[in-house]
């Protein structure tokens, strides 16, 4: 087993991956017009909605457990379609100067409409009502595309609010922006861990240089990569699933306890 980073909290990673999985239950309940609730130990604070194809749908939530705060972002249910249709175009980031980010991630995070505030506004408005001394830790997390939104969200929080110590644990996240974005992120987000399955294709996207011929856009990952391995190279959905990430993290924990 590869050594985990010194400050990486395996128990917290499992908890945050499990919360990331809850966003899919939240989405399914919305789609099926059914009630949804978090596990009993968590208190729901805010539902985060996305505007997509003229519809509003849940993109995650803010919750708390005791003095711990959590911002949790949902990924996509149509992974193969997203990979096929993605253009990877970059645009200037709307909330940090002189950096470029992927168009779709920026739009998903910052877009609202007449009926619902943008996910960005909902998070920042909520945090404006909270004093950093009111909580022990502020955790930002997400899986897949939710991991990309989490990266945008935490750097926005660090740059534009008084909450300077938020902590990111993401799972199966793609690259989000250019070198300048990654550099700015790494300088102002103090605690950041990107858990990736070495067999998962999504963390390899967008390509570092794309499109393949013109190389118009250049992408770079933010810190710090925490590699794990499960599945194989032939099953995109399995290698990318949040359930697979949870299972492997739990296996690492068990192995760590046995070897201790």
Residue ranges and their predicted role:
Residues 1-66:
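N-terminal low-complexity, Ser/Thr- and acidic-residue-enriched intrinsically disordered segments
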Residues 39-141, 159-165, 188-193, 197, ...:
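A conserved cap/lid and substrate-binding interface adjacent to the catalytic center
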Residues 163-249:
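The feature captures the conserved acid-bearing segment of alpha/beta-hydrolase catalytic domains
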Residues 142-146, 150:
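Gly/Ala-rich beta-loop-alpha elbow adjacent to hydrolase catalytic centers
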Residues 79, 150, 177-178:
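Short, well-ordered alpha-helical microsegments
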Residues 75, 144, 172-174:
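Residue-level signal for short, function-critical loop segments
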Residues 152-156:
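Active-site signature of alpha/beta-hydrolase-fold catalytic machinery across serine-
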